Structures are given as structure tokens and as C-alpha cells.
């Protein structure tokens, strides 16, 4: 059962914490953003790539200390299908590092998350 794996990982690491991944492009270090923008231009693909690279670095730093991550779907959806792909790749990467993943996809959430959901479905993408 899934929660048995989580409990086992908590016991192994002696840590019941979960790291939330609520990425916004402005949270990503500038050097990572710059590398993605050079590679893909100022596009949603570049934004999603920068977030993925940052997530991988976070996961690498945390996987031996924190048993689980909780990516918030709204923050990935803000970057179109490329962001949703980044969510899937983040999940796979965390799992490959032995982390338990709890995707937070509830639609009735706090203000910041509701803003992220609203941003995910704009007339045009202006948040790059």
C-alpha cells in the first residue's frame, strides 16, 4: 500500500516532513532561468525547463533528508502544457530518488493557489 511506503521512508529518515513544491518562475535562481531562456527563448517551454532544473536540484538536496514532496498542480499549470509536463517529470524524478509524492491538485484552495489556477487559464500568457 502507498502509505506503507511513506511510513517506511519516514522511519528510515527519522523525519515526518514533506517538502512543498509550489514553483513560480521568479523563485528560480536567475542563472537557471538565464540558461533556459538561452536554450528556448522567452517561452513557456523555457519557464517549464527552468522550473524542472530547479526542482531537480531541490530534490537532489532533499532526498536523503525529507521522505516526500508535495507539488502543487496549480503552479505547474500556470506554464501551460509544458508546465504540466514538468510536473510529471518532477514526480518521476522524485520517485527515482526514493521520495514519496503527494500531488496537491485540489481546486478549492487558499488565495495564492487560486491566483495560480486563474493564471493557468488566461487569455494570453503574460507572466514570463
Regions found by a protein language model. Name each.
Residues 13-17, 65-67, 97-99:
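Short, well-ordered coil/turn segments that N-cap beta-strands
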Residues 17-21, 69-71, 101-103:
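Hydrophobic faces of well-ordered beta-strands that scaffold small-molecule active sites
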Residues 22-26, 74-76, 106-110:
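Active-site beta-loop-alpha junctions enriched in small/polar residues
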Residues 126-127:
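Conserved small/polar residues in nucleotide/adenosyl-binding loops
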Residues 84-101:
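Alpha-helix-loop-beta-strand connector modules within alpha/beta enzyme cores
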Residues 72-82:
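Glycine-rich, proline-tolerant flexible connector loops at the mouths of alpha/beta enzymes
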Residues 108-122:
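Glycine/small-residue-rich loop that forms an oxyanion/phosphate-binding "nest" at active or ligand-binding sites
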Residues 1-61:
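N-terminal glycine-rich anion-binding loop in soluble enzyme alpha/beta folds
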Amino acid at each position: 500500500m502507498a502509505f506503507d511506503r511513506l511510513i517506511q521512508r519516514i522511519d528510515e529518515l527519522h523525519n515526518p516532513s514533506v517538502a512543498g513544491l509550489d514553483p513560480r518562475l521568479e523563485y528560480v535562481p536567475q542563472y537557471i532561468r538565464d540558461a533556459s531562456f538561452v536554450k528556448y527563448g522567452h517561452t513557456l517551454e523555457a519557464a517549464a525547463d527552468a522550473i524542472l532544473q530547479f526542482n531537480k536540484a531541490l530534490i537532489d538536496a532533499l532526498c536523503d533528508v525529507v521522505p516526500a514532496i508535495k507539488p502543487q498542480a496549480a503552479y505547474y499549470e500556470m506554464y501551460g502544457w509544458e508546465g504540466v509536463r514538468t510536473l510529471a517529470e518532477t514526480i518521476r524524478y522524485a520517485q527515482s530518488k526514493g521520495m514519496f509524492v503527494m500531488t496537491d491538485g485540489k481546486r478549492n484552495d487558499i488565495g495564492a493557489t487560486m491566483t495560480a489556477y486563474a493564471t493557468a487559464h488566461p487569455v494570453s500568457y503574460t507572466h514570463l
